[in-house]
Amino acid sequence: MTFSSTGSVRTPVLDVAYEYTGEPGGVPVVLLHGFPYDVRAFDDAAAVLADRGAFVLAPYLRGFGPTRFRDATTPRSGQQAGLAQDLLDFLDALGLDDAVLAGYDWGGRAACLVAALRPGRARGLVTVDGYNVQDIAASGEPAPPDVERTFWYQYYFHSERGRRGLERNREELCELLWRTWSPTWAGASVAFPASAPSLHNPDFVDVVIHSYRHRYGLAEGDPRYQELEDLIAAQPPIPVPTVVLESGADGVGGPLDPQEREHFTGAYEHRLLPGIGHNVPQEAPEAFADAVLSLL
């Protein structure tokens, strides 16, 4: 662990746990992890950023680690609009007008959405997954078979068998995803135990299952996020300065679609990372940190 401190802030829906390092007077940088990861993914990159004067914060997403829902009756939604609103609420709770946003997987999606829908809150964006915004209306369209097979876990989670499998075997299943999504990363199995406790959040299973059903139109969303979902459905452009990091050896999904470039209307840079898998900040912390530093 290289973050120097831990904290918690209350938002309308969550008590958000986070870790931070660096001087509070530095440029704020919010690092956003994905599924099935946690803030440990940023330990090395955060140290580099703090040494360069940034104030680095890494929240645990809803359903992960010490972050908790405030109300037992709140739907345990994993929908993308909820993640985006959580990020906006996190910035508000800390009194941050804006920040450089950097993330991957679920966290990259939250960062992309805030950069698109509330560009004044994002000084810049680092997104590992390109235009990481779900197009739910088109979710019924098949991908090429070689890509579809990498989504087996998503289709598994559509069934009650998959829910039970995640509940009973969460560490085994998620460690398998770590290894298969980062096939060239020899340290995946060694690094996994440090993040495994975050998968035992009491809401982890509900949030994950809802996320992978909602994105395919198989589950209703939380009504409080419907206005945001309506805006997201238009696939809004991202006008803020952006660095896209593309994994050269990602074991889930396929290569970035060149047509995604049209979604970025501000300053833009694409960086290919040969031999790097899905968990970019943990596999290539210097490259990840360098992308963030280019936006400070």
Describe each model-derived feature in a short phrase.
Residues 1-8:
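An N-terminal hydrophobic leader/cap segment in hydrolases
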Residues 2, 15-16, 28, 64-98, ...:
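Flexible "cap/lid" subdomain of the alpha/beta-hydrolase fold that forms the substrate-access gate
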Residues 11-20:
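A short loop-to-beta-strand scaffold at the N-terminal edge of the catalytic core in hydrolase folds
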Residues 19-69, 90:
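Conserved HGGG/HGGXW glycine-rich cap/lid loop of the alpha/beta-hydrolase fold
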Residues 34, 105, 282-283:
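Conserved acidic functional residues
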Residues 94, 291-295:
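C-terminal alpha-helix
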Residues 276-284:
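Catalytic histidine-centered segment of alpha/beta-hydrolase-like enzymes
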